[in-house]
Protein backbone atom coordinates (compact mmCIF):
# COMPACT_ATOMS: atom_id res chain seq x y z
CA UNK A 1 0.00 0.00 0.00
CA UNK A 2 1.35 3.41 -0.93
CA UNK A 3 0.05 5.34 2.08
CA UNK A 4 1.67 3.67 5.08
CA UNK A 5 2.27 5.99 7.99
CA UNK A 6 5.68 7.49 7.24
CA UNK A 7 6.40 4.59 4.93
CA UNK A 8 8.81 5.06 2.11
CA UNK A 9 7.89 4.04 -1.42
CA UNK A 10 10.39 4.31 -4.26
CA UNK A 11 9.00 4.35 -7.77
CA UNK A 12 10.46 4.12 -11.24
CA UNK A 13 9.41 6.24 -14.21
CA UNK A 14 7.21 3.39 -15.45
CA UNK A 15 5.30 3.34 -12.14
CA UNK A 16 4.71 7.10 -11.98
CA UNK A 17 1.26 7.08 -13.67
CA UNK A 18 0.05 4.49 -11.13
CA UNK A 19 1.55 6.37 -8.17
CA UNK A 20 0.05 9.69 -9.31
CA UNK A 21 -3.33 8.00 -9.80
CA UNK A 22 -3.17 6.56 -6.26
CA UNK A 23 -2.17 9.95 -4.83
CA UNK A 24 -4.99 11.60 -6.77
CA UNK A 25 -7.49 9.08 -5.39
CA UNK A 26 -6.21 9.70 -1.85
CA UNK A 27 -6.50 13.46 -2.37
CA UNK A 28 -10.10 13.11 -3.59
CA UNK A 29 -10.98 10.91 -0.61
CA UNK A 30 -9.55 13.51 1.76
CA UNK A 31 -11.35 16.34 -0.05
CA UNK A 32 -14.70 14.52 0.07
CA UNK A 33 -14.33 13.66 3.76
CA UNK A 34 -14.12 9.88 3.22
CA UNK A 35 -10.66 10.04 4.82
CA UNK A 36 -10.78 12.36 7.86
CA UNK A 37 -8.00 14.94 7.62
CA UNK A 38 -7.42 14.90 11.37
CA UNK A 39 -6.28 11.27 11.36
CA UNK A 40 -4.67 11.18 7.94
CA UNK A 41 -0.86 11.14 7.89
CA UNK A 42 0.94 13.78 5.87
CA UNK A 43 2.23 12.49 2.56
CA UNK A 44 5.48 13.89 1.16
CA UNK A 45 6.25 13.26 -2.49
CA UNK A 46 9.87 13.81 -3.54
CA UNK A 47 10.51 13.99 -7.27
CA UNK A 48 14.15 14.22 -8.22
CA UNK A 49 14.50 15.27 -11.85
CA UNK A 50 10.88 16.22 -12.55
CA UNK A 51 11.96 17.23 -16.04
CA UNK A 52 12.69 13.56 -16.82
CA UNK A 53 9.09 12.44 -16.19
CA UNK A 54 7.39 13.42 -19.44
CA UNK A 55 4.10 11.79 -18.43
CA UNK A 56 3.76 14.37 -15.64
CA UNK A 57 4.02 17.36 -17.96
CA UNK A 58 1.10 19.71 -18.12
CA UNK A 59 -0.79 19.07 -21.34
CA UNK A 60 -1.66 21.82 -23.76
CA UNK A 61 -4.92 23.43 -22.66
CA UNK A 62 -6.14 23.45 -26.25
CA UNK A 63 -5.29 19.84 -27.12
CA UNK A 64 -8.00 17.55 -28.44
CA UNK A 65 -7.36 14.70 -26.00
CA UNK A 66 -10.23 12.57 -24.77
CA UNK A 67 -12.33 14.42 -22.24
CA UNK A 68 -13.90 11.30 -20.77
CA UNK A 69 -12.48 8.84 -18.31
CA UNK A 70 -9.66 9.13 -15.83
CA UNK A 71 -7.49 12.24 -15.78
CA UNK A 72 -4.11 11.99 -17.47
CA UNK A 73 -1.08 11.70 -15.16
CA UNK A 74 -0.14 15.29 -16.09
CA UNK A 75 -3.56 16.67 -15.18
CA UNK A 76 -3.70 14.62 -11.95
CA UNK A 77 -0.20 15.83 -11.04
CA UNK A 78 -1.23 19.44 -11.66
CA UNK A 79 -4.23 18.92 -9.35
CA UNK A 80 -1.92 17.46 -6.67
CA UNK A 81 0.27 20.55 -6.90
CA UNK A 82 -2.59 23.04 -6.73
CA UNK A 83 -4.87 21.29 -4.21
CA UNK A 84 -2.79 18.70 -2.35
CA UNK A 85 -1.04 20.78 0.31
CA UNK A 86 -4.31 21.85 1.93
CA UNK A 87 -5.16 18.15 2.21
CA UNK A 88 -1.82 17.02 3.66
CA UNK A 89 -0.15 15.92 0.42
CA UNK A 90 3.05 17.91 -0.14
CA UNK A 91 5.41 17.91 -3.13
CA UNK A 92 9.13 18.60 -3.24
CA UNK A 93 10.54 18.63 -6.75
CA UNK A 94 13.95 19.20 -8.30
CA UNK A 95 14.19 20.54 -11.85
CA UNK A 96 17.43 21.27 -13.71
CA UNK A 97 16.54 24.48 -15.58
CA UNK A 98 13.91 27.19 -15.82
CA UNK A 99 12.97 26.04 -19.34
CA UNK A 100 12.18 22.61 -17.93
CA UNK A 101 10.14 24.17 -15.11
CA UNK A 102 7.98 25.78 -17.81
CA UNK A 103 7.66 22.45 -19.64
CA UNK A 104 6.86 20.47 -16.49
CA UNK A 105 4.13 22.60 -14.93
CA UNK A 106 1.68 25.38 -15.52
CA UNK A 107 2.38 28.90 -14.29
CA UNK A 108 -0.41 28.51 -11.71
CA UNK A 109 1.15 25.30 -10.42
CA UNK A 110 4.53 27.02 -10.09
CA UNK A 111 3.00 29.65 -7.80
CA UNK A 112 1.95 26.85 -5.41
CA UNK A 113 5.62 26.15 -4.59
CA UNK A 114 6.06 28.89 -2.02
CA UNK A 115 9.60 27.82 -1.08
CA UNK A 116 12.14 27.60 -3.90
CA UNK A 117 15.86 26.94 -3.99
CA UNK A 118 17.74 28.31 -6.98
CA UNK A 119 21.35 28.09 -8.07
CA UNK A 120 23.20 30.38 -10.48
CA UNK A 121 21.12 31.18 -13.56
CA UNK A 122 20.44 34.05 -15.91
CA UNK A 123 18.94 37.24 -14.52
CA UNK A 124 15.75 36.71 -16.57
CA UNK A 125 15.26 33.14 -15.32
CA UNK A 126 15.99 34.23 -11.75
CA UNK A 127 13.46 37.07 -11.96
CA UNK A 128 10.86 34.67 -13.34
CA UNK A 129 11.38 32.12 -10.55
CA UNK A 130 12.00 34.27 -7.47
CA UNK A 131 11.06 37.81 -8.57
CA UNK A 132 14.68 38.91 -8.24
CA UNK A 133 17.73 38.72 -10.54
CA UNK A 134 20.01 37.86 -7.57
CA UNK A 135 20.60 34.25 -8.65
CA UNK A 136 22.58 35.57 -11.62
CA UNK A 137 25.23 36.91 -9.21
CA UNK A 138 25.68 33.70 -7.21
CA UNK A 139 29.14 32.21 -7.08
CA UNK A 140 30.29 28.63 -6.92
CA UNK A 141 28.74 26.52 -4.13
CA UNK A 142 26.02 29.07 -3.35
CA UNK A 143 22.24 28.95 -3.61
CA UNK A 144 19.26 31.09 -2.67
CA UNK A 145 16.27 30.03 -0.60
CA UNK A 146 13.21 32.03 -1.59
CA UNK A 147 10.28 31.93 0.84
CA UNK A 148 7.37 33.61 -0.87
CA UNK A 149 5.10 33.59 2.19
CA UNK A 150 7.69 35.25 4.44
CA UNK A 151 9.04 37.41 1.62
CA UNK A 152 12.64 36.40 2.34
CA UNK A 153 15.61 35.53 0.18
CA UNK A 154 18.52 33.83 1.92
CA UNK A 155 21.92 32.83 0.52
CA UNK A 156 23.35 29.52 1.72
CA UNK A 157 25.89 26.81 0.86
CA UNK A 158 24.21 23.62 -0.33
CA UNK A 159 25.76 20.25 0.32
CA UNK A 160 25.82 17.02 -1.64
CA UNK A 161 22.73 14.82 -1.71
CA UNK A 162 22.54 12.41 1.22
CA UNK A 163 23.37 8.76 0.63
CA UNK A 164 20.80 5.93 0.83
CA UNK A 165 21.67 5.27 4.49
CA UNK A 166 20.59 8.76 5.47
CA UNK A 167 17.19 8.28 3.81
CA UNK A 168 16.72 4.94 5.58
CA UNK A 169 17.64 6.50 8.93
CA UNK A 170 15.26 9.43 8.34
CA UNK A 171 12.43 7.00 7.47
CA UNK A 172 13.09 5.06 10.70
CA UNK A 173 13.00 8.25 12.77
CA UNK A 174 9.74 9.33 11.16
CA UNK A 175 8.22 5.89 11.79
CA UNK A 176 9.18 6.14 15.49
CA UNK A 177 7.33 9.46 15.81
CA UNK A 178 4.03 7.80 14.96
Regions inferred by a protein language model and the residue ranges of each:
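P-loop NTPase catalytic phosphate-binding loop
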Residues: 1-128, 178
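Phosphate/diphosphate-binding loops
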Residues: 122-127, 131-150
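Conserved P-loop NTPase motor module
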Residues: 56, 60-66, 74-75, 115-117, ...
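Generic secondary-structure transition motif, activating predominantly at the C-termini of alpha-helices
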Residues: 24-27, 133-134, 160, 174-175
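Generic hydrophobic/packing signal
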Residues: 48-51, 81, 130-134, 145-146, ...
Amino acid sequence: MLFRSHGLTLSTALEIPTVISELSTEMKMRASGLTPLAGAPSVFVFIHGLHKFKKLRQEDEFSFGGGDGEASPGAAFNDLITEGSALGIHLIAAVDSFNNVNRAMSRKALTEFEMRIVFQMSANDSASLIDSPKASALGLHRALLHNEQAGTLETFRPYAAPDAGWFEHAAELLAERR
